[in-house]
Amino acid sequence: AVLNGNALAIMVALVPAALVNQLLGAMTLNGVVTSLAMMVTLAQSALPLIAAFTVGTMLKLGMMETASMALATLAGSGVTTFKDGTFTLAGSGVILNVMLTTAVAGLVAMGATKVLGQLRVVFEPLIVLVVAGGIGLMTLPGMVAVQAAVGQVVASATAAAPLVMG
């Protein structure tokens, strides 16, 4: 469910930008082009939220659990930065960390539902956010390094491909 949900979220959040950005580059800047660019960029940044909702749905969780997962995934994804009292939303986050955080958030949400009973309405969002989002924030630097290393390997393989095929 975690892999399928994240794969679907990647398709929903990232494919529109991949399709439209190529077309927008060839167009003259005007209000419509600027609005389209803003919409697809915002869709990319919504990847952590979409991932949490797709994974939560595939795990057959309720709205409270799924929304709590979305909070935790947004917090742990790396899509937001906080500097000088201001939050900045940029990019789609670290996809590996989005996947890890959705998995942890799903487990925490399922556990909290069983343990908290009627108190879950009050405490579940906080527990899922603090535990799963906190784990996401702690693993973020390591996942950034892993993602960068994978990117370097892919870039090297892409650069070497003409030589190998030569």
Q: What kind of region is each of these model predictions?
A:
Residues 1-166:
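Signature of multi-pass transmembrane helix bundles
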